[in-house]
Amino acid sequence: MDVLLYFGGDIQDTQENMKHAGSKAYIEWSLENTAKILTISFPKKHVFLIRPSRVLETLSYFDNFVPSKEYGIPVFCPTHNALKHLQELLKSSVNRINMYNTDKELTHLNIEKAKLTLVGFSKGCIVLNQLLHEFHYYQNKLDPDIEINNFIHLIESMWWLDGGHAGSKDTWIVEKSILESFAKLRIDVNVHVTPYQVQDSHRPWIGEEESHFCNILRNLGIPIKRTLHFADKTRSLQNHFNVLKAIWNYTQ
């Protein structure tokens, strides 16, 4: 069973909630439409979109995965039980699907045999970054948590799509010890960025941190796949969202 878990960005919400003035122009990127886009790029995967625990105006807060300040700025910590929450959320979703699965030809989903792909877009990348902290935490725990360690080993790949948030640091994880723990897991790493984030002259730390993140992992022997999209185009929010479609060429 191949499963993709998606964490979206600010503005992204259900079509119904995006009909108001602040989001209407971006309804193309509603969660329903994003699910269709991801299904085209990952046709063999069951796609789950995980909504933020709350949305204030157009700002997303993933409080159940990572502590956040004003504007959804993350405050990373060794553990916020994000992995446990993700595991329980997936279990609950799979159980519900199996309950309503009346088609005898469809195989019931089994989480213990799942191959997981985690995708973060824009603000949603803060969840992936918190998971990196938790990988480190569980690897160094004196009393190993076998259940969580087994869950971690279901994760085959992680995709960072143009990560960004309103804070002035920690857009990308650059602590070497945390990335060393991550590298030991041999998870496939995919980074797709656009000038909207990594070439923002008002937020130069984003590009600097992204470069450090990629370089540290490469130096640790991880064959990271990194792509800059729309390099010849003017920085725009539209092309920031377009990265969701652009990854299609890299998933076939």
Predicted regions and their residues:
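Short, surface-exposed "cap/lid" segments of acyl-processing enzymes
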Residues: 1-63
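Structural beta-sheet core signal
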Residues: 6, 49, 118, 160, ...
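Conserved beta-strand elements of beta-rich interaction domains across eukaryotes
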Residues: 9-12, 54-56, 123, 164-166, ...
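Short, flexible/disordered intra-domain loops and linkers
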Residues: 15-27, 59-74, 169-171, 199-208
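Alpha/beta-hydrolase active-site loop
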Residues: 30, 60-110, 133-141, 148
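Structural alpha-beta junctions
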Residues: 32-48, 154-155, 181-190, 214-226
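Serine-dependent carboxylesterase/thioesterase catalytic core
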Residues: 97-187, 198-201
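C-terminal catalytic histidine-bearing segment of alpha/beta-hydrolase fold enzymes
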Residues: 190-252
